A protein has these predicted regions:
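ASCE RecA-like P-loop NTPase motor cores
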Residues: 1-142
Length: 142
């Protein structure tokens, strides 16, 4: 609610279970191909992590048998950014995890059609996207 008040944006994409806090029908996992937010300013809130077994099943289906566990506060470098993230030491599992998370975030951010429309998408996540411009915000101090 603080984010919504701070940004003033009507449209939000976040987790399905937070739907009661914002308007609209889109959420992580169900926004691919939707054009209803074209040209609209959007807040994308959250990082769409998947259960650990999904990353491992993905690796296993590619023929890899990986035995690694998620490690909190791991310093990583991705998309030109260095940040701390709960991820794997194993490079393959990390690549799979990042691909799945990044794909879902790109789908959410892409609903505004930023390349064709003059609008703004605020991404509130601990996973920066390649085209992100990092800004320090004081929304949580008010």
């Amino acid at each position: 609610e603080k984010i919504k008040k701070w940004t003033g944006f009507e449209n939000t994409i976040s987790f399905k279970e937070f739907h009661k806090f914002y308007m609209g029908d889109l959420h992580f996992g169900n926004c691919a191909g939707c054009d209803i937010l074209k040209g609209e300013n959007i807040d994308v809130i959250g990082t769409p992590h998947q259960p650990e077994w999904i990353y491992k099943l993905f690796a296993y289906s590619l023929g890899y048998d990986v035995d690694d566990r998620l490690k909190p506060n791991t310093q990583v470098e991705h998309n030109g950014f260095r940040f701390y993230f709960m991820t794997y030491t194993d490079k393959l599992l990390r690549a799979i995890q990042f691909y799945i998370i990044e794909s879902e975030l790109e789908q959410a951010v892409g609903r505004a059609r930023l390349l064709r429309c003059d609008c703004v998408v605020n991404l509130f996540s601990d996973f920066p996207l390649r085209q992100a411009t990092l800004k320090e915000a004081k929304y949580d101090t008010e």
